[in-house]
């Protein structure tokens, strides 16, 4: 079920976030998840539902009457409770590579320096084996919660990779390194705030810190208002034939001329027509050597046969690129709504290729040897492998 948590910190800053949990999830586990999202230690949190505080940490959420879509209030106590901690005390707050999470990161960044120092000193990070540096406990919790695992993979890829590797030692090392790095940054931040206000170096660093906060705030707004801007799109390719040989052509209205790789020209048997007097250097993002030019060749798009000229490049990953010279010559129109390329001189159209039919150099990178696997399948496979390794480790540790 999906629960919305309205969080009020001790400094009266507010934040709202959502958690996907099971109905039989116990309250102490829920407190730990709230700590990861809000930064409020579980021992200092008070959870209220329907104006009634939830106190029994071993009862399930469903036993309190919580259901899908409900809202709970998380308050930070004025003074930490001195009684012994619950089952998951002081779980480490993960720094998701300093990427602001919508609605959660900005208030925490504005905490007073004293509050930050109380949670970020190196002594706290390395002193308590059952507290902030209990990687085995944290690993088991993340592996048991697919929602938190997906957030970790999105916001802290290095730690997620170490977690899914199944190697507890590697996971512990990465976790401690990130905690220590966070402590160093916080100490540097506190030092800058307490430095001489007329120190130019300190002021420059404070200015840079403010600039980084503005960047993260801008990114937070983008993640909330336009999350699609963080996705990747595949380029526009079409099927065609050159001299009777099938070729996948890249449609690029930003390229000045139509080009073809030397390997593709050899496959299409048009290297004999290359005029090497047109040799030179093609400049764009990088540079490529132009071997020469084929002044006239026949390109077949669907049922149309169109005359075209090519500049032949020596080292080019894509076989063929339809540039602006070819597109304007045949009055081509890129219709993204219909996902087609319209040939204006003939009225015919051809569909842009889906990612599965693109050449390997044009597909989105999912990892070596895994180009044909969808991202969600990769995530499921990695999660299954990590759970299996965790179960095997638990079996080996049994007396």
From Swiss-Prot:
Keywords: Aspartyl protease, Chromosome, Cytoplasm, Hydrolase, Phosphoprotein, Protease
Pfam families: Asp_protease, Ddi2_HDD, ubiquitin
Location of the Ubiquitin-like domain: 1-81
Record: active site: 252
EC numbers on record: 3.4.23.-
Phosphoprotein recorded as keyword: yes
Family, similarity comment: Belongs to the DDI1 family.
Name of the molecule in the record: Protein DDI1 homolog 2
Organism: Homo sapiens
């Amino acid at each position: 079920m999906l629960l919305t948590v309205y969080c009020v910190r001790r400094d009266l800053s507010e934040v709202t976030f959502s958690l996907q949990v099971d109905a039989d999830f116990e309250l102490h586990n829920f407190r730990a998840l709230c700590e990861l999202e809000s930064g409020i230690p579980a021992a200092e949190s008070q959870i209220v539902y329907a104006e009634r505080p939830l106190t029994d940490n071993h009862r399930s959420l469903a036993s309190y009457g919580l259901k899908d879509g409900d809202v709970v209030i998380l308050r930070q106590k004025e003074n930490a409770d001195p009684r012994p901690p619950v089952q998951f005390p002081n779980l480490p707050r993960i720094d998701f590579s300093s990427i602001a999470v919508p609605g959660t990161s900005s208030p925490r960044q504005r905490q007073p320096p004293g509050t930050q120092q109380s949670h970020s000193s190196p002594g706290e990070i390395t002193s308590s084996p059952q507290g902030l540096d209990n990687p085995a406990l944290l690993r088991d919790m993340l592996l048991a919660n697919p929602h938190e695992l997906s957030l970790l993979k999105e916001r802290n890829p290095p730690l997620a990779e170490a977690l899914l590797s199944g190697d507890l030692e590697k996971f512990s090392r990465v976790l401690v390194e990130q905690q220590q790095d966070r402590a160093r940054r916080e100490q540097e931040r506190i030092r800058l705030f307490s430095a001489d206000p007329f120190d130019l170096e300190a002021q420059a660093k404070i200015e840079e810190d403010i600039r980084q906060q503005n960047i993260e705030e801008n990114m937070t707004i983008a993640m909330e208002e336009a999350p699609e801007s963080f996705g990747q799109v595949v380029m526009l390719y079409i099927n065609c034939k050159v001299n009777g040989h099938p070729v996948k052509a890249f449609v690029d209205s930003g390229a000045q001329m139509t080009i073809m790789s030397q390997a593709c020209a050899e496959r299409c048997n048009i290297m004999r027509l290359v005029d090497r007097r047109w040799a030179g250097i093609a400049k764009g993002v990088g540079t490529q050597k132009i071997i020469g030019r084929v002044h006239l060749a026949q390109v077949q798009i669907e049922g149309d046969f169109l005359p075209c000229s090519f500049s032949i490049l020596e080292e080019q990953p894509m076989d063929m690129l339809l540039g602006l010279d070819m597109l304007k010559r045949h009055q081509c129109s890129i219709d993204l709504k219909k996902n087609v390329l319209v040939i204006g001189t003939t009225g015919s159209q051809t569909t842009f290729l889906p990612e599965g039919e693109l050449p390997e150099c044009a597909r989105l990178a999912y990892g070596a040897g895994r180009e044909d696997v969808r991202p969600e399948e990769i995530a499921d496979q990695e999660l299954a492998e990590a759970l299996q390794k965790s179960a095997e480790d638990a079996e080996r540790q049994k007396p």
